[in-house]
Each structure stands twice: as structure tokens, then as C-alpha cells.
């Protein structure tokens, strides 16, 4: 899509100094399983669905992460669980209902502040401002901070020469997650019959299969741990200075130099 960017330059005003403050806020609401647009099975429904697949002798994909009911069933077949242990752990999973949206997203308020001062006389005027913006995404610990400053000066050096100076600077920092983690997609697609924490309140890790490769390889995985230790931190800054001289040589001839 085509777009137009409009850049507006603030100029000082004639008169005594005027100080102004602007505040803007934005509220973002996180998704929830109760939202009408989200239709995801709860733990009991997911376990029932898995049981139906097993009863129909469904062949699960070989590259599938064996978690939830399928993971317990594999342990039962491998004699790692007794029938009683299997039944007890399945019953626990049926009431688990892990709220991935609550763990991975949050309601956020973003805010932007600007303080400016302007003033001057018929011979010279000024405008100065400082600003701060904090933009918070609904994804856990995904945010953007930006500090800005600007100064514009205009003065009549003589009746035929005018000078102006513009200084603008900014400092920004951004924290965001690795794209392959995709917390929102994870919350939509991951079974609620998978715990995020173990019985001791520590992160629960499951064996996740690495994509590709001839031989299957697995690694311990918990998305909360990944988000804590795999974020990107990006910093940047910028400074621009523009000076301009305008010459009114005659009533019909003007010149300028930057």
C-alpha cells in the first residue's frame, strides 16, 4: 500500500514563553480463551479427543512432540508407567487447563509524553521540546522506549538576512522476542493439557524434537524459559543539525544556503 509521510517543523512564536505538556495513552487488551474469536479445547476436551484417536487406531506422526495424553501413553507402552500411574496422571491433566494466554501475554498501557517551550520576539524566536515514549506490546516483555529532543531557532540578523538552526536527537531501545518463538502462535496452538510448571513451582520441561535431521534429536523445552533467556535487545540513536541562511537581496531576488 502507498503512504504519505508528513513532516511538520515546529517554530517559535512571538511573545512571552509558553510551556505546554502533551500526554497520549493507548490500552491494549490481551487475548483470552473466553474471547468469542478464540475456540480452543480445554484440557478435558483435548484428552477426550486424544482417546478417540487412539480408539480409532490413529497413527500419530513420527515427528510429533509427545506431550499430554500422547506422552503419557508412550510412557505406558514403554513400561515407564503402571496402569494406575497412567490413570492418575491422565486425571490430573484433564483438570490442568494451563492458561497460555495469561502466561505469555498481558494487558498493557503505552504512553507518550512531550514537554515544549516556545517564545521570542519579532527579531528572534525559539522552540524546544523533549519527549518520552514507552510502547508496550501485549506479548510478555516486548517493549520499545524512545527519548527525543528538538531545538529550533530563528533570528533576523539584518533586514535582508535571516538565520535558522534546527537540532534534533533521539535515543531508542527495544526488547523483543526471537521470531521462531512466536508466543502468540504458541498460545493458540499448544494443548492446555501441558503444564507450564511442575509440582514444585519450577518450569516444566518437555522433550521437543529438533526440526530436520535423519535421526530424531530432542531437547528440553519450556517457552517461558526461552523468553527469559532468548530476547533481543536493540539500541539506537540519531542526531541531525541543520543551519539555514536566507538572503533577501532585492524585492524580486531571494537566496538561501544550507
Describe the predicted segments one by one.
Residues 129-131, 248-250, 258:
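Acidic/polar N-terminal loop/beta-strand segments that form early-domain functional surfaces
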Residues 1-20, 110-112, 125, 131-133:
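A beta-strand signature from Gram-negative outer-membrane beta-barrel systems
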Residues 9, 115-121, 149-155, 241-247:
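Residues on the lipid-exposed face of transmembrane beta-strands in outer-membrane beta-barrel proteins
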Residues 88-118, 122:
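Outer-membrane beta-barrel transmembrane domain signature of Gram-negative proteins
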Residues 13-96, 107, 137-144, 148, ...:
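Surface-exposed loop/interface segments of Gram-negative outer-membrane beta-barrel transport/assembly proteins
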Residues 253:
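An active-site-proximal structural segment forming one wall of the substrate-binding cleft
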Residues 14, 110, 121-122, 158-160, ...:
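Outer-membrane beta-barrel channels and translocator barrels
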Amino acid at each position: 500500500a502507498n503512504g504519505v509521510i508528513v513532516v511538520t517543523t515546529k517554530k517559535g512564536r512571538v511573545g512571552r514563553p509558553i510551556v505546554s505538556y502533551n500526554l497520549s495513552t493507548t490500552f491494549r487488551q490481551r487475548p483470552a480463551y473466553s474471547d468469542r474469536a478464540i475456540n480452543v479445547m480445554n484440557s478435558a476436551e483435548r484428552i477426550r479427543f486424544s482417546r478417540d484417536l487412539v480408539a480409532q487406531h490413529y497413527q500419530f506422526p513420527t515427528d510429533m512432540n509427545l506431550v499430554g495424553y500422547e506422552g503419557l501413553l508412550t510412557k505406558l507402552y514403554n513400561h515407564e508407567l503402571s496402569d494406575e500411574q497412567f490413570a492418575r496422571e491422565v486425571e490430573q491433566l484433564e483438570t490442568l487447563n494451563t492458561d497460555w494466554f495469561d502466561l505469555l501475554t498481558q494487558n498493557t498501557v503505552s504512553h507518550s509524553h512531550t514537554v515544549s517551550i516556545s517564545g521570542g520576539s519579532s527579531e528572534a524566536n525559539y522552540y524546544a521540546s523533549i519527549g518520552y515514549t514507552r510502547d508496550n506490546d501485549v506479548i510478555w516483555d516486548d517493549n520499545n522506549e524512545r527519548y527525543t529532543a528538538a531545538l529550533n531557532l530563528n533570528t533576523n540578523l539584518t533586514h535582508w538576512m535571516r538565520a535558522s538552526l534546527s537540532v534534533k536527537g533521539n535515543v531508542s531501545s527495544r526488547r523483543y522476542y526471537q521470531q521462531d518463538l512466536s508466543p502468540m502462535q504458541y498460545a493458540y496452538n499448544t494443548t492446555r493439557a501441558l503444564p507450564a510448571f511442575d509440582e514444585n513451582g519450577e518450569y516444566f520441561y518437555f522433550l521437543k524434537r529438533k526440526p530436520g535431521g535423519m535421526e530424531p534429536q530432542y531437547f528440553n523445552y519450556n517457552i517461558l524459559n526461552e523468553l527469559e533467556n532468548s530476547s533481543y535487545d536493540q539500541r539506537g540513536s540519531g542526531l541531525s543539525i541543520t543551519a539555514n541562511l536566507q538572503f533577501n537581496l532585492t524585492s524580486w531576488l531571494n537566496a538561501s544556503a544550507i
